Amino acid sequence: MKKRKSVGLLATIILGLLMTMTACSGTTADKPKSDGKTLNLLTWEGYADPKFVKGFEEKYGVKVTVTYFGSSDELVSKLKGGGGNVYDVISPSSDVAGYLVREGLVAPINLNNVPNYKNLAEKLKNMNDVKKGGKVYGVPFTWGPDSLIYDADVIKTPPNSWKIFWDPKYKGKVSLWDDISNIYLIGQMMGLDKNDPSALYNMSDAQLQEAKKKLIELKPQVRKYWATAGELNDLFSNKEVVLAVGWPLTPKAVNASGRNLKEVIPKEGITGWIDRLMIVKSSPNKELAEKYINYVIDEKVQKIVADVTGYGVANKNAAKYMTPEQAKSIHIDDMDNYMKKINFWQEVKDRDKYNEIWNEVKAQ
């Protein structure tokens, strides 16, 4: 009897060891299998920072390379200009994501390989522009506003209107993004989206001509049209500008050196963006790309993404790792209400015409 008890005890110990080894090794999906591969990203600035990419490289034994784009038009141009055979993962904004799906430039994502998807904000997952035929083509990553950014050491009273850009006191001290989104801004000043947010993205010829006139009038005030967030950071750091349209990345980066930039929502409103991660249709690394997407939407990694960018992140659970001040600063503590203040970019059906107007403004 004692011997049988010993045999039974030994079997129990061996079973326990096997269970422990299995638990430590994780699920099959978690196992690194991609040694030596390279994953190529085509993203906005800040979306491939070593602070969170390095962890992925180490976990899966791979290398991540990144190419940045400065506008949605540049992203589409790169993809259509041969980039479809170069890049694996891209980060389009909400103004072109649906177009990429419709044009067949991206592949559906197997959400079984992206278990963290279930933890993303429902409001972001419920948007239909990246869904087709019951399949999902884009996973929400970050979101944010196109705010009015100002140097609070120079402008003591927070601006309440975009009209401050035309104030003669700030001639040569304003910066705009080199992008058609400036037309959206003028559309908001014209009150076009009071009852219909999509009106900014479907302006009539007469409305576009009016926007062009306003933007040409603004040109003497403009120090420079910035092409990248880094360029706008430099303009503020060098005190070349005191007002700009920009993203939360800029006050976060510039204020780290002791400056005092702030951002506000003017009374006319603001536009904003939702950035998704998508997989290029011809990517040879789709499985690795899905692992990457799952990794960077993990709640702990999303906290690091917020640290780096200052942007809102898609995984609300990231707030568990933030101070109340950080959660408030990126509006993750009140995401649904804050999002109601933003007119998020939509696809511009006649994008060529918008680009034509913007190019005419710059050529004047």
Range-by-range predicted roles:
Residues 30-100:
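Early extracytoplasmic/lumenal segment of secretory-pathway proteins
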Residues 97-99, 245-260:
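A ligand-binding cleft/hinge motif common to bilobed small-molecule-binding domains
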Residues 209, 214-218, 257-281:
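Periplasmic-binding protein-like
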Residues 270-271, 275-339:
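Mature extracytoplasmic/periplasmic domains
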